Regions:
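Short, structural beta-strand-to-alpha-helix junction motif
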Residues: 1-4, 24
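Detector for the mature cores of small, proteolytically processed
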Residues: 9, 15-52
Length: 52
């Protein structure tokens, strides 16, 4: 599933423990929206998405 298909408000996208994006799903940069995620989980009220 691609990241752009997520419909949640607060999201953090990480790659190798480095944060690539943190904010609202609607504001994700186009290059990240097309990436597929490896792992997704909740941390508090935020959704954490890990990519390769």
């Amino acid at each position: 599933m691609k990241i752009k298909e997520l419909r949640l408000l607060n999201i953090t996208i990480k790659q190798n423990d480095q944060i690539l994006f943190q904010g609202k799903t609607e504001e994700i940069p186009p290059n990240l929206k097309e990436m597929e995620y490896e792992k997704i989980y909740f941390e508090g009220v935020d959704v954490i998405v890990e990519i390769n």
